[in-house]
Amino acid sequence: MLPTVRKAFRERGKLRKTIAGHCVQEQLEGVAIVQDQGKPLGASMGQCTTLGRFTERSFTYVPAATLSLKQIQLLLGITAIWGMNWPVMKYAVTQYPPLHFRTLCMLFGMVAMWFVARQMKVSLKVPREMWGRLALLCIPNMIGWHLFCILAVKELSSGRAAILGYTMPVWAVLSGLAFAHPVSRRGWIGLTLAMVAAMLLLSSEFAAIAGSPLGVILMLIAAACWGFGTTLIRHYPTGLHALTFTHAMMPPTIVAMGLAGFWFEGTDVGAPQGWSQWWPIFYNAFGVFAFCQVAWFSLAKSLPPVVSSLSIMIIPVVGVMSGSLFLGEVPHWPDFVALVLILGAMAVILVPGRRSK
């Protein structure tokens, strides 16, 4: 069993420190890495297991990560609220300028987070030494994603935007190259499927009389920002509570989105008028930012990538179905084919394959 343990740690973990070949500290990815009498062994994402000598007596077995009831509830909530938010955003940007809409969503969302933090007795104070790291994480995870996403939603149907947005896991795999993580064969297969889907939708937009190829490109850029940002979160942990972590990135994002709104949409945009313009803002402020954004970062830091990312596979399906139900959007055959390809890409990348015994 001992060589299997060493091999598993080399393949599935990130070697932190080795002293004379005896003392090893590993940060595991949180999947089942060893089989011992049919029982999977592993460790949760971000948990460090310090081993003594590589002997069966001193080896510490840590149970593989499992989902608690609370985590299951968070995943279901994220799936429903984020999935239905695609038609909500599409409706909102037809009623109000998109960049101003997103800025107001985040502004009210930050206030909602403050109240949630008070109720949970979570400190929102960020140590000074973390400011630079948070600024780095904020650029792709918040500014890049929200800026390009909301501009793309204005150009595309909500279902098509959702399909393209959830190419994120593919971009997360590619972004691993920046950290010298080679792309596996499954990663390249997933990338190929996602690119075929993107090209199919792009060609469909070119062929349509009122199509918007720019919308496809903007949504792919947004997804790439999200994927790269998710990778950065795992490589540059802050140790902050998920609520503190998310809240701290809101002010610079609000400033960036506000400036972009003034630049592209002008300064004479009035306040939202009527319930038709206000309710999407409240939905995003409380549902997306105060709940989904915090829950996502919490799961991204506490669960393995495989577990936390599997939850997003159903979101584009919810987006397509809810867009058809609430907005009367009619998906065409390129949308269905692209959806299948994207789901296939996510499955190839996120679902662990069988390993030889």
Language model region names:
Residues 6-7, 12, 19-24, 36-103, ...:
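Glycine-/small-residue-enriched transmembrane alpha-helix faces in small-molecule transporters
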Residues 83, 107-111, 195, 254-255, ...:
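Small-residue-rich packing faces within the transmembrane alpha-helices of Major Facilitator Superfamily
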Residues 113, 167, 183-205, 313, ...:
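Hydrophobic transmembrane alpha-helices of multi-pass small-molecule transport proteins
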Residues 67-71, 95-103, 126-132, 188, ...:
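Juxtamembrane helix-entry segments on the extracytoplasmic side of multipass membrane proteins
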Residues 79-83, 137-146, 168-169, 202, ...:
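Transmembrane alpha-helical core positions of polytopic small-molecule transporters
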Residues 129-136, 183-195, 216, 240-249:
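Cytoplasmic-side transmembrane-helix entry/capping segments in multi-pass membrane proteins
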Residues 81, 85-86, 114-165, 198-200, ...:
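Specific transmembrane alpha-helical segments of multi-pass solute transporters/efflux pumps
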Residues 102-104, 142, 146, 160-167, ...:
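Helix-helix packing/entry segments at the starts of transmembrane helices
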